[in-house]
Amino acid sequence: MSQLQQFCHNRFSWGLLLLSAIGLELAALFFQYGMDLAPCVMCIYIRVAVLGIILAALIGILQPKVWLLRLVGMAGWAVSAVWGFKLAYELNQMQVNPSPFATCSFYPEFPSFMPLDTWLPSVFSPTGMCSDSPWSWLSVSMAQWMMLGFAIYGVIWLLMLLPALKSAK
């Protein structure tokens, strides 16, 4: 078994994924409560995509030697990374090319069986405008940083895909 395959089959790799996503969620909460930056509905959806990566990592960390759990974890990771990139790209477009006709809603549209904004409004209730870009670092907006983050998640997923899905011999 190759070193990359061994890495994919242990809890440490899934733990790194989990810690990175938890770090992003904590950063989002710091921006919201520490720096008093109001999250928009797209920001909330991006948080949900990061939460999807957390859930995928938790599935993978349960029993990383079991092929089916790795498969489900990898699938959740991929869907969350692609969806998160798409959302961050759309938010970036709203900020770079603002239009009075292309605005985001003030109310998140979560499924009726999972109203996250009702269950945990302090985390999932939007209070800001999508066209606002109140924070940047190195002349890069938060939406652009999230595009980079989700792209990195996607590249790492691609590197881990085949070794993770091969069974141990």
Swiss-Prot record:
Disulfide bonds: C40-C43, C104-C130
One of the GO BP terms on file: protein folding
Membrane topology term: Multi-pass membrane protein
One GO MF term: electron transfer activity
Transmembrane segments: 14-30, 49-64, 72-89, 145-163
Any single Pfam family the record assigns to this protein: DsbB
Keywords from the UniProt entry: Cell inner membrane, Cell membrane, Chaperone, Disulfide bond, Electron transport, Membrane, Oxidoreductase, Redox-active center, Transmembrane, Transmembrane helix, Transport
Any one Gene Ontology cellular component term annotated for this protein: plasma membrane
Localisation: Cell inner membrane
InterPro entries, per database record: DiS_bond_form_DsbB/BdbC, Disulphide_bond_form_DsbB, DsbB, DsbB-like_sf
Stretches in topological domain Periplasmic: 31-48, 90-144
Cytoplasmic-facing ranges: 1-13, 65-71, 164-169
Family: Belongs to the DsbB family.
Role: Required for disulfide bond formation in some periplasmic proteins. Acts by oxidizing the DsbA protein.
Cited NCBIfam families: PRK01749.1
Protein name: Disulfide bond formation protein B
Organism phylogeny: Bacteria, Pseudomonadati, Pseudomonadota, Gammaproteobacteria, Alteromonadales
